[in-house]
């Protein structure tokens, strides 16, 4: 059977000809405006959602802390993900919205740059850390919260073009 992912595949840009990890050389790429949007969910009991919305939590402002953690995380992505390029970020916005139907919170991050490579990992890191921080801030109320559906919602700009996956 033929290997569907040969080590020298052009699709595996983070591997060299010997299959060793490498940081992709983007020095010949043109700087363009690039944006990525990612989302995550934190599912919780209705009582936990109500307590967070009312501000009745032992650690303080859950949502403000989670939002700031997400922004800070986007800026640290290259320090967390080994082969990510450090990028100048022009915009990082983290929105945390209550969703009584879940019940819990929807988290959405939008990250924008003018650079040689995209910001998908920065957006995904932002929602992941915002969700983890929300969990940390509210775990005294409920330890059974679930972080779910971390996904890339869209990516625009760059050589590979725009990406809009189908809704889950």
From Swiss-Prot:
Q: So where does substrate get bound?
A: 83-85, 121-122
**InterPro entries attached here?**
MoaC, MoaC_bact/euk, MoaC_sf, MoCo_biosynth_MoaA/MoaC, Mopterin_CF_biosynth-C_dom
What processes in GO biological process is this protein linked to? Mo-molybdopterin cofactor biosynthetic process
Tell me where on the tree of life, at the top rank, the source sits.
Bacteria
Q: Which GO terms describe its molecular function?
A: cyclic pyranopterin monophosphate synthase activity
Going by the record, the broad EC class of this enzyme is lyase
Please state the pathway this protein functions in, per its UniProt record: Cofactor biosynthesis; molybdopterin biosynthesis
Q: Which Gene3D superfamilies match?
A: Molybdopterin cofactor biosynthesis C (MoaC) domain
Q: Which reaction does it catalyse?
A: (8S)-3',8-cyclo-7,8-dihydroguanosine 5'-triphosphate = cyclic pyranopterin phosphate + diphosphate
Under Pfam families, the record lists: MoaC (PF01967)
Any idea which residues are catalytic in this one?
136
The alphabetical list of record keywords is:
Lyase, Molybdenum cofactor biosynthesis
Q: What is its EC number?
A: 4.6.1.17
Q: Which family does it belong to?
A: Belongs to the MoaC family.
How is the quaternary structure described? Homohexamer; trimer of dimers.
What HAMAP family does the record tag this protein with?
A: MoaC_B
Q: Give the protein's function.
A: Catalyzes the conversion of (8S)-3',8-cyclo-7,8-dihydroguanosine 5'-triphosphate to cyclic pyranopterin monophosphate (cPMP).
Name of this chain's protein: Cyclic pyranopterin monophosphate synthase
The species this protein was found in: Trichormus variabilis (strain ATCC 29413 / PCC 7937)
The gene from which this protein is expressed is: moaC
């Amino acid at each position: 059977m033929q290997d569907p992912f040969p080590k020298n595949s052009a699709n595996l840009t983070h591997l060299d000809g010997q299959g060793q990890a490498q940081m992709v050389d983007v020095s010949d790429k043109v700087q363009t405006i690039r944006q990525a949007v990612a989302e995550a969910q934190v599912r919780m009991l209705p009582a936990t959602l109500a307590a967070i919305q009312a501000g009745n939590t032992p650690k303080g402002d859950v949502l403000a802390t989670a939002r700031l953690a997400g922004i800070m995380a986007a800026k640290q992505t290259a320090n967390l993900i080994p082969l990510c390029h450090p990028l100048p970020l022009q915009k990082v916005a983290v929105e945390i919205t209550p969703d009584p139907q879940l019940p819990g919170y929807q988290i959405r991050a939008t990250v924008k740059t003018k650079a040689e490579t995209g910001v998908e990992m920065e957006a995904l890191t932002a929602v992941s850390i915002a969700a983890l921080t929300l969990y940390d801030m509210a775990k005294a109320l409920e330890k059974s919260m679930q972080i779910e559906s971390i996904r890339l919602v869209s990516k625009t700009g760059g050589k590979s073009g725009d990406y809009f996956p189908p809704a889950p």
